[in-house]
């Protein structure tokens, strides 16, 4: 595999994920145990009807099918929805050992075509060892897609990511937007919106496993997919074979009032701080055509002063959403650039233009239908899990504290999302990840990740205990394996998937 190919596949899916929610991030009345859920699934599984995949972006060896699952697992005999899946058979059937499921991030915004391109970048020994299977999670893409019909202004990344509306950090405008967006979901989202959450996604994954006729499942989950993979390991521990969790999210629900999603948002505070020194070092290098300052120490005040100025005096930006370059758009653009160091030049160009009172050409937005679908899936996944705070005073206090401690993110990670006004009762609290079950997990984690900071990955590592080994990679950006990691980390993951050999203990890849 060449780095160029893997980068292209990764960037394609990253751009869509960023538009929807970035990586960052989720019901049942019966006990969430493997005993209650795995055996009946296996008995009811129907053989899949594989056909040629329709549409562009699929390889010639690729097959597509649909797995029928309950819309509501509390009513398993009720209405069904179809989960779109795709398969690329092992390139060497004589050594095939099972299925490797690619679990996408988001949540929301991925597509079967993009995940398929990612599968084709895997090293030869992995492509030989497994049938590679990808899927669109419920409500997403080809799997009964949902939409809230958000207003145009609410499709901006600075709207879904709740940057404080006013330059003083007031949350009042965000709560108004939350009510407007939640109302759109209630009017337009349909019944499925109430049944999109991480536990339902995990049960869908087990339905896919059963429909494939596999006793156990191997998987590679990235970003939100790392959390979904951890939940699957918790609910179906004896169905797991080799699991790779990549760019790991903080799954410590106890620290966030029973809600993993609030912790995922909060992770941006530390994640952006972790990456900024690398950006500052790059942006102060002599000879850099996008140099922002003479020293790395000067880059931070340059950025903060400019963001504050744009809060007060935004620059018109025709064609952009929103149609101005304000302080929050600048902050959001920097955060997006931090997902991949190759994005540093774009962020620096924007900063240089804004300092002169100008803007570059507006980036072309993704198709509106894709945005609407991704945002609706992300909203439901987050909001259906746990009861979110609704108090303006609580949000204001947390935002004020965050702005003081983490000025680069200006309070956004602690602000009110549309979940503060979500019209439906929560399905359940987040699943508590434990160390109970077989040792089948290899975690791979970049040291500097804006959306999945190392501190959060360590929380997940501690929760998994003896079930996991973690490889920490001396690298910057989101997506470690075959993305923004390094050769040492890539080799460790490939070796585990192909041979089952994991490092004996937690490892640091320089």
Regions found by a protein language model. Name each.
Residues 1, 351-355, 399-404:
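Short linear, low-complexity motifs centered on an aromatic residue
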Residues 1-38, 67, 205:
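Secretory targeting and sorting signals
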Residues 315-331, 339-343, 368-376:
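Structural motif
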């Amino acid at each position: 595999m060449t780095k160029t190919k893997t980068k292209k596949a990764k960037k394609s899916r990253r751009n869509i994920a960023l538009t929807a929610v970035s990586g960052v991030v989720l019901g049942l009345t019966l006990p969430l145990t493997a005993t209650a859920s795995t055996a009946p699934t296996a008995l009811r599984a129907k053989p899949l009807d594989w056909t040629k995949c329709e549409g562009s972006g699929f390889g010639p060896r690729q097959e597509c099918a649909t797995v029928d699952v309950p819309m509501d697992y509390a009513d398993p005999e009720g209405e069904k929805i179809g989960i779109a899946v795709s398969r690329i058979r092992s390139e060497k059937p004589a050594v095939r050992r099972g299925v490797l499921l690619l679990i996408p991030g988001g949540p929301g915004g991925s597509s079967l075509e993009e995940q398929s391109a990612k599968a084709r970048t895997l090293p030869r020994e992995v492509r030989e060892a497994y049938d590679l299977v990808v899927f669109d999670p419920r409500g997403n893409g080809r799997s009964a897609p949902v939409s809230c019909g958000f207003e145009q202004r609410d499709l901006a990344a600075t709207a879904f990511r709740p940057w404080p509306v006013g330059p003083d950090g007031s949350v009042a405008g965000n709560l108004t937007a939350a009510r407007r967006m939640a109302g759109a979901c209630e009017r337009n989202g349909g019944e499925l919106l109430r049944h999109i959450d991480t536990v339902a996604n995990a049960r869908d994954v087990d339905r896919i496993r059963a429909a494939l006729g596999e006793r156990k499942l191997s998987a590679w989950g990235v970003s939100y997919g790392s959390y979904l993979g951890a939940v699957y390991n918790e609910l179906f521990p004896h169905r797991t074979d080799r699991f790779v969790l990549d760019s790991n999210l903080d799954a410590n629900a106890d620290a966030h009032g029973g809600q993993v999603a609030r912790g995922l948002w909060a992770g941006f505070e530390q994640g952006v701080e972790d990456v900024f020194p690398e950006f500052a070092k790059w942006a102060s290098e002599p000879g850099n055509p996008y140099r922002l300052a003479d020293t790395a120490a000067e880059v931070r005040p340059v950025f903060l002063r400019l963001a504050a100025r744009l809060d007060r005096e935004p620059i018109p930006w025709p064609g952009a959403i929103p149609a101005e370059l304000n302080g929050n758009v600048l902050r959001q653009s920097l955060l997006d650039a931090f997902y991949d160091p190759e994005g540093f030049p774009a962020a620096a160009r924007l900063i240089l233009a804004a300092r002169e009172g100008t803007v570059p050409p507006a980036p072309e937005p993704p198709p509106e239908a894709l945005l609407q679908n991704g945002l609706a899936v992300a909203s439901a996944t987050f909001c259906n899990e746990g009861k979110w705070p609704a108090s303006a005073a609580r949000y204001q206090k947390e935002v004020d504290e965050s702005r003081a401690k983490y000025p680069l993110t200006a309070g956004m990670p602690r602000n009110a999302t549309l979940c503060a006004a979500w019209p439906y009762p929560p399905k359940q609290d987040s699943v508590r990840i434990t160390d109970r079950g077989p040792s089948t997990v290899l975690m791979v984690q970049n040291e500097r990740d804006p959306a999945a900071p190392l501190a959060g990955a360590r929380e997940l590592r501690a929760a998994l205990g003896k079930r996991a080994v973690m490889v920490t990679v001396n690298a910057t950006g989101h997506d470690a394996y075959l993305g923004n990691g390094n050769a040492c980390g890539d080799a460790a993951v490939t070796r585990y998937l192909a041979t089952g050999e994991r490092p004996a203990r937690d490892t640091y890849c320089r």
